[in-house]
Every structure is written in C-alpha cells, then in structure tokens.
Swiss-Prot record:
The lineage of its organism: Bacteria, Pseudomonadati, Pseudomonadota, Gammaproteobacteria, Enterobacterales. S-adenosyl-L-methionine binds at residues 73, 78, 124-125, 139. Its EC number is 2.1.1.170. It holds the Pfam family GidB. Keywords: Cytoplasm, Methyltransferase, rRNA processing, S-adenosyl-L-methionine, Transferase. Belongs to the methyltransferase superfamily. RNA methyltransferase RsmG family. GO terms for molecular function: rRNA (guanine-N7-)-methyltransferase activity. Signal peptide: none annotated. This is Ribosomal RNA small subunit methyltransferase G. It comes from Escherichia fergusonii (strain ATCC 35469 / DSM 13698 / CCUG 18766 / IAM 14443 / JCM 21226 / LMG 7866 / NBRC 102419 / NCTC 12128 / CDC 0568-73).
Amino acid sequence: MLNKLSSLLKDAGISLTDHQKNQLIAYVNMLHKWNKAYNLTSVRDPNEMLVRHILDSIVVAPYLQGERFIDVGTGPGLPGIPLSIVRPEAHFTLLDSLGKRVRFLRQVQHELKLDNITPVQSRVEVFPAEPPFDGVISRAFASLDDMLNWCHHLPGPSGRYYALKGQLPEDEIASLPKEFQVESVVKLHVPGLEGERHLVVIKPNRI
C-alpha cells in the first residue's frame, strides 16, 4: 500500500515524510478494520480508500488559511484526519453527531498519537465556537446554504468556509445568502479519481 500511496502523492505533486505516509496508511487500515462492524464508509477496498478518502482530502491542504479548523459532519474523520496528518502545525476539531463515529476518531487519535485533533460528539448548530475558528470545512455534508445557516457562528471575523464538492454547484452558488460571497473556486486534481472535484471557498460579506 505504501508504493500505491507514494505513486498517488507523486502524481498529485504532494511531498510527505515517511512518518506521515505511515500515519495515513495506519488510518486506512483502521478504517478498513472498524468499517466491518461500524459501517463508517461505503468504500470497502483499502486501495480505493487511498484515492477516494486520503488523496481527495489532502489535496485541499494548500488552500487552507489559518491554524484552527473545524471539520463539520466529519463522519470517520474525513477530511479532518488526513488533513491533520499533513498539516501537523494546525489544529482540527472533528465534529459529528453519531457516537460510534466519535469513538472511532478517539481510537485513531490514540493509536496514531495525533495531538492536533479534538473529536467532539455534537450537532453543529449547538456547538459553541470558543474561540472562533479560522476555517470551517465540510465534505459531503450539506448544501452551501445549509452549511452557512448551520455553521455561521463558527468562524471568526476573517474566517473562511471550505466546501469540498464534486461537480461545481452553480445553483447553490447562485443562491448564496447575501451575507456571504464566494472568494474562490478551485478545481482539484485527485489522481485516480474519476469525475470532477472542486473546493468552494466562501467568506462573509463585510459591510
């Protein structure tokens, strides 16, 4: 699996240490193992997880501004766990409402010795952001409108919303609440993944 991961990283132009690669592989192995009992992801094949979960998460790392992030609706830690491995200087709060997912995240934190994540079981709309976050990240979480409605209290004054999407959601972008604007749209290159991937970066309008 290490050779497969190294090849994917090379194709994506991403440079990681051997320790980071081993952490990512350990996470995939845990996800594969726990998935049998906990049904954490529909992806069953570990090699497919490397593409659809690991690479699909870490390609957004260069676009994240700040040091404190919250991954809302993280599920089994996507994209938060892979991002925490490739951005060890940043801190990631991993938020999910299901206890079984958070139990898995805590086990990952323990086994991989990740001191820059905080798994939390909570609904996003009632979670207090103290202090506010630099970035709110979502992957397959909700529409842009719902994301902004549920997460509006989470970022600080200069914070950003980072929404990982497949095809560019032009209808969702067109119907954004007037309090927000799209700062940038990045077309992502994920080696081995068919279909389009986009990162939509949104910021509050300052009147």
